[in-house]
Design a protein with these regions (language model features):
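Small-residue (primarily alanine) positions within well-ordered alpha-helices
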Residues: 16, 28-30, 58, 65-66
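A basic/glycine-biased coupling hinge at the interface between accessory DNA-binding modules
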Residues: 3-4, 21-23, 43-199
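Walker A/P-loop
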Residues: 21-40
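Conserved RecA-like helicase ATPase core segment
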Residues: 2-8, 34, 40
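Pre-Walker A adenine-sensing motif
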Residues: 7-18
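Glycine-rich phosphate-binding loop at the start of an alpha helix
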Residues: 10, 39, 186
Length: 199
């Protein structure tokens, strides 16, 4: 790699760019150059290690970060896959979801859509939204999904009145989503994990 690439980086950043064997973690505050390091690392892999850009996957949490990485990497002439965790999982599920009985044209429900489904599930179960906040129910289901706890597993762990209500609502919520050929944001991650585990 020409030195002009590295001159913009401090010694620690240069080490991160040049290390290609084994895992590496970059911990730093906002605005400290993490995205720059990743961008330069991609260019190093492509230009110096002859890595095919199609074999590089960059994943981040936010659309803003993904778009920033895409812009920087493309300015440097590369085109690896850059995505958020959710968009990557959605793409995988649209292609391979058939193995877990998902149609490729599933809808992705945002928070408001999900709250509407929670309210519908509560209505079907005759559980009052005055007694239990739909947003709290949704937050509990979201937490369960982030821990990879399915609706059937949640029932086994439910303790106390609130969790027992969530345990009743969770499967009805999932059933409504399924009937609508929809996934919520947490399902994108959860279903992808299940897909990989089962196949």
């Amino acid at each position: 790699m020409n030195n002009y690439f590295l001159k913009d980086l401090n010694k620690e950043q240069q080490k991160a760019v040049l290390q290609t064997e084994g895992p590496i973690i970059i911990l730093a505050g906002a605005g400290s150059g993490k995205t720059r390091v990743l961008t330069y690392k991609v260019m190093y892999l492509i230009n110096e290690k002859n890595t095919n850009p199609l074999n590089i996957l960059m994943v981040t949490f936010t659309n803003k970060a993904a778009n920033e990485m895409k812009e920087r990497v493309r300015k440097m002439g590369a085109s690896p896959t850059i995505a958020t965790f959710h968009s990557l999982c959605a793409k995988i599920l649209r292609i391979e979801g058939k193995y877990i009985d998902l149609l490729p044209q599933f809808a992705i429900y945002d928070t408001q859509d999900s709250l509407d489904v929670i309210k519908e599930a509560m209505k079907r179960l005759d559980i009052s939204v005055k007694d239990y906040k739909p947003s709290s129910i949704l937050a509990s289901i979201s937490s369960a999904k982030n821990e990879l706890v399915s609706e059937s597993e949640y029932l086994r762990y439910a303790r106390g009145n609130f969790q027992e209500k969530v345990a009743k609502i969770y499967p009805v919520y999932q059933k409504i989503l399924s009937q609508n050929h929809a996934l919520d944001f947490d399902d994108l991650l959860l279903k992808t994990v299940f897909l990989f585990e089962e196949n």
